[in-house]
């Protein structure tokens, strides 16, 4: 319960901060499309720099302490933004430095918490635990942008970071109060490099994980592009306000919350394999409606909202399913490294996807760029249909693969 509460607070703060960053860069610092793509890339660049070592370190350390330390670092970095704004010294470079620090902290927090869940929940309940944490993420998506949009309507965008810092304080307090005993990390005399190589060899040799790893990496590249283009579509092409953007994103998260709750129904009726394929492809296809809304400006807000709700619903079912499958397959001593490798695949390619999306949008226009990146995401989803994971007919981690 404390982990769930802490993650809910952290996700709300993250979403408020993400909206504030977009608003500051676009409206206050007047950043170009390319600069916005670079700023978004810096927030995930840390996974390329320390993603793999972080997994090995987390396997050596107590996960709860790692999460607390990461939160304290984020709090310190976040409070520098409103301070610089008050002193009239806020620059795009400062914003980029903070984004990089937040990215580094997020690497350790995310790897630790994904590795912590299987240690405090039995394998039978890993799916339920992940569903609850994903519901927290969707609560953050639903409440964060709306709260952030409302806040940015009454205070300057840089001051919104104070609320983000406050949510990380709440998250730290909740995690600190967890009393479930954490198993002592397995001690190893192996070097850091040897442990990283062991983790890579495990994923590479696992016939379900490795093909899934490749498809997830490709999908993450495309999703990063879509994510950086949507605020440009809403704020610049459709001339909506930051408040409206926040409300649109919040509405979309309702679908994600419902997806986290109804995932067991999908698994019971379709099994893991077909659930992975169907929900991923549908979840990406409906995004096509968002750039198409340019041609119906009077209905654009409704089109983007409905598309966001549907996409979030299906992709949440998919994400919880693939995450739970990975955790059930992986032995406990490898959890940190396995999660770090997948995070490396997802977040490591996202800086490239974000940056490329900014360049493509600058040359072809936002609408064409969104169509292109949506097509890439669909291709990645179709590829999953040809992996061993798609042939899992059961609802457990040791199913029969036909």
Predicted regions and their residues:
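C-terminal transmembrane bundle of multi-pass solute transporters/carriers
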Residues: 1, 48-52, 60, 64-70, ...
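Helix-loop boundary and gating motifs at the non-cytosolic
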Residues: 1-46, 201-252
């Amino acid at each position: 319960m404390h982990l769930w509460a802490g993650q809910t607070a952290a996700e709300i703060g993250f979403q408020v901060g993400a909206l504030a960053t977009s608003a500051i860069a676009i409206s206050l610092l007047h950043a170009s499309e390319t600069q916005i793509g670079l700023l978004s890339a810096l927030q995930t660049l840390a996974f390329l720099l320390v993603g793999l070592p972080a997994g090995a370190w987390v396997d050596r350390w107590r996960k709860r302490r790692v999460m607390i330390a990461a939160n304290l670092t984020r709090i310190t970095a976040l409070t520098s933004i409103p301070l610089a704004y008050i002193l009239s010294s806020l620059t795009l470079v400062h914003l980029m430095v903070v984004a990089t620090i937040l990215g580094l902290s997020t690497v350790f927090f995310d790897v630790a918490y994904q590795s912590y869940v299987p240690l405090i929940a039995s394998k039978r309940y890993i799916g339920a635990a992940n569903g609850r944490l994903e519901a927290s993420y969707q609560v953050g998506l639903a409440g964060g942008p709306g709260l952030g949009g409302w806040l940015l309507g009454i205070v300057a965008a840089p001051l919104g970071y104070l609320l983000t810092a406050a949510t990380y304080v709440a998250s730290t307090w909740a995690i600190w109060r967890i009393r479930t005993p954490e198993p002592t990390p397995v001690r190893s005399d192996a070097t850091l490099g040897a442990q990283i190589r062991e983790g890579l060899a495990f994923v590479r040799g696992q016939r379900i994980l490795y093909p899934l790893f490749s498809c997830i990496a490709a999908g993450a590249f495309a999703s990063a592009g879509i994510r950086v283009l949507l605020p440009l579509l809403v704020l610049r092409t459709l001339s909506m306000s930051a408040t409206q953007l926040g409300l649109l994103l919040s509405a979309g998260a309702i679908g994600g919350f419902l997806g986290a709750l109804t995932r067991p129904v999908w698994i019971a009726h379709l099994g893991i394999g077909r659930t992975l394929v169907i929900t991923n492809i549908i979840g990406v296809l409906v995004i096509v409606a968002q750039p198409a809304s340019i041609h119906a400006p009077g209905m654009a807000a409704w089109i983007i909202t409905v598309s966001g709700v549907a996409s979030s619903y299906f992709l949440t079912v998919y994400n919880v399913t693939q995450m739970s499958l990975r955790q059930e397959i992986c032995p406990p001593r490898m959890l940190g490294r396995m999660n770090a490798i997948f995070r490396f695949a997802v977040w490591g390619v996202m800086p490239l996807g974000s940056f490329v999306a900014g360049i493509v949008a600058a040359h072809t226009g936002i609408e064409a760029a969104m169509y292109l990146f949506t097509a890439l995401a669909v291709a990645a989803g179709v590829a999953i249909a040809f992996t061993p994971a798609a042939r899992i007919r059961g609802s457990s981690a040791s199913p029969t693969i036909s």
